Amino acid sequence: MADKGKGRDVGDAPRSSDALPWVEKYRPATLDEVLSHQHITSTLERFIDAHQLPHLLFYGPPGTGKTSTIMALAARLYGKSYRSHVLELNASDDRGIDVVRGQIKAFASTRNMFSTQTDTFKLVILDEADAMTQAAQAALRRVMEQYTRNVRFCIICNYVNKIIPAIQSRCTRFRFSPLDAEQVA
């Protein structure tokens, strides 16, 4: 797996806390630690418990917990096998059609040989997906359709109107509102 995207590698040995950026050091590691947006985390918990996780679209202003929430969900789903089940990409860096046709399709087209009942699908996390080109989003839609049995996608963006309707319609959408002052303190 390419080591791209945000966040710590949940399945790896912990790094020295002095070397971690502040945002990584204090990022919630579990859904219980995500204190804001309880309605979203409780819905995600129900999806996990029912083994029925859909494609997800998280949108809202920066700093509202979108990335932290999906990383905590992935940690709950996969634990130590996180790295073999999750592909994290920052779409503002990898925004073109070649990434969709190359990295994402290659990851989506393979299955894990030793998967259990609870982790039969992989997860692709596309952060800042509103930076993807229209052509890349159209290619992503086709990959989502073709590999939906094997992979779930979490599309994260600040501006949902920059995500093509064909992708929006294939995802369960969650709006992350700005945090209250007492939630930040």
Where are these regions (language model features)?
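P-loop/Walker A NTP-binding region and its immediately flanking N-terminal helices
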Residues: 1-173, 177-183
